[in-house]
Amino acid sequence: MVDSLDTATPARRRRSDARRSVDAILNAARVVIGERSDASMEEIATTAGVTRQTVYAHFPSRDALIAALIEAAAAEYAALLDAAGLDTAPPADALAQFLDAGWRFIRRYPLLLDPTATGIPRPTSNDPHDVVPPRLERLIQRGQRMGDFDGSLHAAWLAAAVIGLQHAAAAEVADGRLTAREAAALCLESTLRLCGSSARPTASR
């Protein structure tokens, strides 16, 4: 029994060390590639505080690292949406929280909106292209049923338009035409008007 515990502890420690290395590498990749989409594996290793060999031990190629980063980003965005109260908060509040989750995600993963970045894969799970529209559509439908949103327009169309508005606002920030604060405020106001909201988010009252 003692022998099995003695061997299990180093194994757990190695797994824990490996997990920390992977997390450090992914976080470094998020930051470095977010600043410069063509950053090298050497630069990522330096930022992560590990050797290039350690990076390659976990990710055999830069493409593999990017794919893992995209998977992590998709999971993080899904968690942000889960925490946003989209199905429970008052509709106007939920809509504001949906947009806020998007802004936080964009700030953490600017790579995803970088027009110079090429070869960005789609995630295999929690793909925002698949996950986000139906969740937003469900929120808008709830607001329409409650009378908080205008019910004369199709919820799927409104969801697509809201997503497009936020992408457009993010592009304005990336091009230096708006500050992040200005873009967030304009996007929220435009979204509420688009949905015909008869209520205002609690935070903006």
Regions found by a protein language model. Give the residues of each.
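Alpha-helical DNA-contacting segments of helix-turn-helix folds
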Residues: 59, 64-73, 116
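Short hydrophobic/aromatic patch on the recognition helix
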Residues: 49-59
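Hydrophobic/aromatic-rich alpha-helical bundle segments in the mid-to-C-terminal region
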Residues: 113-118, 126, 130-133, 145-190, ...
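Basic, helix-initiating cap at the start of DNA-binding domains
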Residues: 1-35, 39-47, 64-67
